């Protein structure tokens, strides 16, 4: 058993969310454990230990669940369960948005670009978290896509999913009347840009540190150290899987 493997109780919680009772040659628990192992260790598919099912089968389920939205479903439900467990409402009232530019792997990938500000050639993760640092939404774009442009896509993706969301906090990189309009029209929320009043002195912006901490948490998962994926949908799924891995340990 590896440190990333699920306990029986943890697997039962995820299995209830997946809700697929078809008979299989290999238990879903073994397949999930293999994917969590890859997420944490950052290894290639073909290097999966023999204790797990074949890498081809594991990859098949990974892609199937990317396309079917299963990773997002698991991540969303676990977040609701965890929020309730710590005494909060299942749906958050505050979101915090930020981005992280990540280098791509050495071999050529589509959907990549150069972030002139961070001097990174690759892709950019745009994430929204709640006040616990739990993932609400993730979108991956080429690194040259401006934060304000990507934030529009994030807000559109979040539409209809968070009925209590009253405000989204952002830093000075997110500007534009359209973001304010989209937050109000799509989410019935306020989009608030929070900046440091004194640029000459470092100050922690209230609650902004939460999303920065979440990004640091994701960096503990070596599959996220670079972007190795052939498409951005898989890139987004690995962020969701990292979030699942962190939350399931709380149960």
Report each predicted region and the residues it spans:
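Short alpha-helical elements
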Residues: 1-251
């Amino acid at each position: 058993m590896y440190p990333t493997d699920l306990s029986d109780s943890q697997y039962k919680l995820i299995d209830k969310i997946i809700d697929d009772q078809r008979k299989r040659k290999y238990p879903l628990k073994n397949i999930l454990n293999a994917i969590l192992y890859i997420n944490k260790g950052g290894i290639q598919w073909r290097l999966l230990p023999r204790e797990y099912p074949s890498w081809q089968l594991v990859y098949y389920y990974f892609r199937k669940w990317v396309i079917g939205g299963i990773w997002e479903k698991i991540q969303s439900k676990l977040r609701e369960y965890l929020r309730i467990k710590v005494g909060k409402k299942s749906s958050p009232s505050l979101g915090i948005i930020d981005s992280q530019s990540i280098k791509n792997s050495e071999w050529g990938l589509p959907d990549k670009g150069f972030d002139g500000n961070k001097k990174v050639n690759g892709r950019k993760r745009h994430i929204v978290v709640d006040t616990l640092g739990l993932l609400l939404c993730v979108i991956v774009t080429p690194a040259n896509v401006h934060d304000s442009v990507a934030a529009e896509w994030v807000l559109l993706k979040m539409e209809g999913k968070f009925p209590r969301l009253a405000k989204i906090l952002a830093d000075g990189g997110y500007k534009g009347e359209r973001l304010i309009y989209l937050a109000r029209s799509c989410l019935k929320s306020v989009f608030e840009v929070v900046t440091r009043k004194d640029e000459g002195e470092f100050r922690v912006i209230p609650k902004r540190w939460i999303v920065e901490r979440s990004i640091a948490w994701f960096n503990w998962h070596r599959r996220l150290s670079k972007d190795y994926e052939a498409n951005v949908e898989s890139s987004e799924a690995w962020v969701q899987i990292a979030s699942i891995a962190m939350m399931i340990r709380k149960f």
